[in-house]
UniProtKB/Swiss-Prot annotation:
Species in which this protein is naturally found: Clavispora lusitaniae (strain ATCC 42720) (Yeast)
UniProt-annotated binding residues for Zn(2+): 280, 283
Name under which the protein is recorded: ATPase GET3
Family: Belongs to the arsA ATPase family.
Signal sequence region: none
Function field: ATPase required for the post-translational delivery of tail-anchored (TA) proteins to the endoplasmic reticulum. Recognizes and selectively binds the transmembrane domain of TA proteins in the cytosol. This complex then targets to the endoplasmic reticulum by membrane-bound receptors GET1 and GET2, where the tail-anchored protein is released for insertion. This process is regulated by ATP binding and hydrolysis. ATP binding drives the homodimer towards the closed dimer state, facilitating recognition of newly synthesized TA membrane proteins. ATP hydrolysis is required for insertion.
């Protein structure tokens, strides 16, 4: 390319049309800190709009990052009133689903109900499925707002996902396309076998309810699929550290995301030492290795926003510390000017 893209996330923060932002990468590279920082900057940039940060990682860290307890329902961040957070809880969600299912079947001794209760907690991919249900819920609220329907639900300008490590995230992002195909097949089969089931007797109204619900879900899933593959509405921010394994996994993830037609044009590189003028030999040696992989990333991702974030002297916890750290997503870190901040973070309460 003849020009280098800005090494910041400014284009994402100020892209007014974005509805969904995914933040993902290998385990332990700083996804939660990055997603929290993105959410904080969005909330600061648009003080009159509401934002939601959702953790889809089974091992949640949002409560630790903000020093505030979050759960399965969206809760406002203390000190940032237009940002809410929630952590997907599979156990609580499955309990809610079973309660809803009782309206169709009140028999407590039903072996099928008992079997489903035992199975759901251990189904592979249940976290991804529940996260997707949360997406469907917000799509429904979005549609109600567009139609002018009355809704008590908060309308979020943008929803940010603090995702699980790469494999879980890729499974989650495959769900819309896979579900759309499955529901189309189901619709086709129900058209063929529906009359036969009616002839066998009973359950006509219940069948109509089920088919109506399936049509509604199919419409929402198609809408999700459409929005997730629209670069004006959805983008993915890759997070990594400057090491071989992380770089390798980032490349694999980008190739996979491109195969889903998902927009990805930003990479955040965390935990950089910037140790040119440091007397510590270990730091200099580590920085030399980091620079080698940074150079490779610069060549490999010249048409990406490559954001370089420093390793700080203490943990980045609490809204005030996140505000300080997240500024470097918009203004590149300069070790000569900003070095003092590395050791200036407040002690998390």
């Amino acid at each position: 390319m003849d020009f280098e893209l800005e090494p910041t996330l400014e284009s994402i923060i100020h892209q007014d049309s974005l509805k969904w932002i995914f933040v993902g990468g290998k385990g332990g590279v700083g996804k939660t800190t990055t997603s929290s920082s993105v959410a904080v900057q969005l909330a600061l940039a648009y003080p009159n709009d509401e934002f939601l940060l959702i953790s889809t990682d089974p091992a949640h860290n949002l409560s630790d990052a903000f020093c505030q307890k979050f759960g399965k329902d969206a809760r406002k961040v203390e000190g940032l009133s237009n940002l809410s957070c929630m952590e997907i809880d599979p156990d609580a969600a499955m309990s809610d689903l079973q309660t809803q299912a009782q309206q169709y079947n009140n028999d407590p001794n039903d072996p099928l109900k008992s079997m489903m209760s035992d199975m759901t907690g251990s189904i592979p991919g249940i976290d991804e499925a529940l996260s997707f249900m949360e997406v469907l819920k917000h799509i429904k609220n979005q549609r109600a707002a567009d139609d002018g329907s009355e809704s008590n639900a908060i309308q979020y300008k943008t929803i940010i996902f603090d995702t699980a490590p790469t494999g879980h995230t890729l499974r989650f992002l495959q769900l819309p396309a896979t579900l759309e195909k499955l529901l189309a097949k189901f619709k086709d089969l129900s058209g063929k076998f529906g009359p036969m089931l009616n002839m066998l007797g009973g359950g006509t109204n219940q069948q109509q309810d089920i088919f109506s619900k399936m049509n509604e879900i199919q419409k929402s899933v198609s809408e999700v699929n459409e929005q997730f593959t629209n670069p004006d509405m959805t983008t993915f921010i890759c997070v990594c550290i400057s090491e071989f394994l992380s770089l390798y996994e980032t490349e694999r993830m980008i190739q996979e995301l491109m195969s889903y037609n998902m927009d990805v044009n930003s990479i955040v590189v965390n935990q950089l030492l910037f140790a040119e003028e440091d007397d510590c030999k270990r730091c200099q040696s580590r920085w030399k290795m980091q620079k080698k992989y940074l150079d490779q990333m610069g060549e490999l991702y010249e048409d990406y926003h490559l954001v370089k974030m420093p390793l700080l002297g203490s943990e980045i916890r609490g809204v005030n510390n996140l505000k300080k750290f997240s500024k470097f997503l918009l203004k590149p870190y300069d070790p000569k000017v900003d070095k003092a901040l590395v050791f200036e973070l407040e002690e998390a309460k």
